[in-house]
């Protein structure tokens, strides 16, 4: 399935139906009086978070969504039918922003969340509403109110417990494929991964979601390479596994490059709990392994894990450590959630 994480969409709620000018006509009733019904209300625009979606690809092919108009009122005091709503279905993690992309209108993080984005126009009054003691046969009715319209941006930030970050070809996709059922494209050239990928990791009977983020290079926050567009998906991660290619020229410099890009992006990415690992260690000689490990240790100011997704060395240790950090963060988030005060 193709991946799309942002889309610009036009939405419009339905116009209200017009009121009706009508008079009661029955045999033997000479002055039946007004009986024009009100117009129906226009349909609303809703956005709903549903299960089974992980991309906004549907909104590449359809960008305009309009709710139905309300029906006009009818005689015999019959109100027009309400216009049907239009519902935009999005995956969990979708933000709704205004046209300028500066104001977040809603953030849908849980399946089942549903918000009313635009309200349909009210129906107009029929002539029965205008009957007074001095005007027993009004010949006026109101038109329905117009619906609302606006352009919005849908922006998806994948919800994952942990994220894989690193330079291109650091072994992130290989690690994801080795630890989950995901099947990312793997090749020996930079930027093999062009879109984020998700997989479910199972460790000791417990699970967490792992995201593979496309590689960063120096200047990504300024648009170099594929830029930092996909770093938004890291914002929701509770922890990061930073993979540094052991076969790179200098492991310490590679680590610092990615850390600089995380700091330049902002939004607290450089403050997230981080586990540092030297990858592809099966391809290193003992002397080079020791040298790269020391370089990375000095740069990260912590002892890195040594792992190889191909041979399986250090993989389970990394996953268990990642799981412990994720569960610790989950517990901290639950502790911070406000609890309703008890009331008798």
Curated annotation (Swiss-Prot):
Signal peptide extent: none
Superkingdom classification of source: Bacteria
One Pfam family this sequence matches: GTP1_OBG
All residue ranges annotated as the Obg domain in the record: 1-159
Residue numbers binding GTP: 166-173, 191-195, 212-215, 279-282, 308-310
Keyword annotations of the record: Cytoplasm, GTP-binding, Hydrolase, Magnesium, Metal-binding, Nucleotide-binding
A biological process from GO: ribosome biogenesis
Recorded GO CC terms: cytoplasm
Annotated TM spans: none
Quaternary organization: Monomer.
Physiological role: An essential GTPase which binds GTP, GDP and possibly (p)ppGpp with moderate affinity, with high nucleotide exchange rates and a fairly low GTP hydrolysis rate. Plays a role in control of the cell cycle, stress response, ribosome biogenesis and in those bacteria that undergo differentiation, in morphogenesis control.
Listed PANTHER family: DEVELOPMENTALLY REGULATED GTP-BINDING PROTEIN-RELATED (PTHR11702), MITOCHONDRIAL RIBOSOME-ASSOCIATED GTPASE 2 (PTHR11702:SF31)
Database matches in NCBIfam families: Obg_CgtA, PRK12297.1, PRK12299.1
Protein name (Swiss-Prot/TrEMBL): GTPase Obg
Species of provenance: Xanthobacter autotrophicus (strain ATCC BAA-1158 / Py2)
């Amino acid at each position: 399935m193709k991946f799309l994480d942002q889309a610009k969409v036009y939405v419009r709620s339905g116009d209200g139906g017009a009121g009706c000018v009508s008079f009661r006509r029955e045999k033997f009733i000479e002055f039946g009086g007004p009986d024009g019904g009100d117009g129906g209300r226009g349909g609303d625009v809703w956005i709903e978070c549903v299960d089974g979606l992980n991309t906004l690809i549907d909104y590449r092919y359809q960008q305009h969504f309009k709710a139905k108009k309300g029906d006009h009122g009818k005689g015999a005091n019959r109100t027009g039918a309400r216009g049907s709503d239009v519902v935009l279905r999005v995956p969990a993690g979708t933000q709704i922003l205004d046209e300028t992309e500066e104001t977040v209108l809603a953030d849908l993080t849980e399946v089942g969340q549903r918000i009313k984005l635009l309200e349909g126009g009210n129906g107009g009054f029929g002539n029965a509403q205008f009957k007074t003691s001095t005007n027993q046969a009004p010949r006026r009715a109101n038109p329905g109110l117009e619906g609302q319209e606006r352009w919005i941006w849908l922006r998806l930030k994948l919800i994952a417990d942990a994220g894989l970050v690193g330079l291109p070809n650091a072994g992130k996709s290989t690690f994801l494929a080795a630890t989950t059922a995901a099947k990312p494209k793997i090749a020996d050239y930079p930027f093999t991964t062009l879109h984020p990928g998700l997989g479910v990791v199972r460790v000791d009977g417990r699970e967490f979601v792992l995201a593979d983020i496309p590689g960063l290079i120096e200047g990504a926050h300024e648009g170099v390479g594929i830029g930092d567009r996909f770093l938004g998906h890291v914002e929701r991660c509770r922890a990061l596994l930073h993979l540094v290619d052991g076969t790179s020229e200098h492991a310490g410099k590679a680590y610092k490059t990615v850390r600089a890009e995380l700091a330049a992006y902002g939004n607290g990415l450089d403050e997230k709990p981080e586990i540092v690992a030297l990858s592809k260690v099966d391809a290193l000689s003992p002397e080079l392994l020791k040298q790269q490990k020391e370089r990375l240790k000095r740069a990260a100011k912590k002892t890195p894990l040594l792992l190889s997704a191909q041979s399986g060395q250090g993989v389970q240790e990394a996953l268990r450590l990642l799981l412990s950090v994720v569960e610790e963060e989950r517990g901290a988030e639950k502790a911070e959630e406000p609890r309703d005060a008890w009331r008798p």
